[in-house]
């Protein structure tokens, strides 16, 4: 059995854009995406709403294998104590190696470092692996929007989860 090595987690840089865009396209699935599959020409991964500093990336053997996006859920000052996970992706080759868990733990630590008191996320109801992972890291279901999305002709719940920091 190979020795476990935790991924190296760091803040994204503009130089990561191409790899992140490819990872995002390669991991697209109706298990977690509510937008259509990306088609060329592909939009920029980073833009005025999606800045490199919003992303933590995971590397194994110096290869980018995952990311998590940590952002404000709203622009309201009254909500500034909350951060939200707004994207998590792990390459197929790195699944089952603890990359997703390491990214979630790094996001929790980073949200705390930035002064957040709560961390929230939304996950599709049929994404059982992600829901189990989030629950194992202390997230609880805080609300469900039944049948919020229609994906491939099937109505899917939108599940709000959160945890105190």
Where are these regions (language model features)?
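Short hydrophobic/aromatic beta-strand or adjacent loop that forms the aromatic wall/cage
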Residues: 53, 156-160
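Conserved GNAT acetyl-CoA-binding A-motif
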Residues: 111-122
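Conserved active-site alpha-helix within GNAT-family acetyltransferase domains
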Residues: 101, 126-143
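Conserved beta-strand-loop-alpha-helix junction that forms the acyl-donor binding cleft
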Residues: 121-131, 147-154
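Glycine-rich phosphate-binding loop
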Residues: 94, 98
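Acetyl-CoA-dependent GNAT
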Residues: 2-7, 11-17, 22-93, 104-106, ...
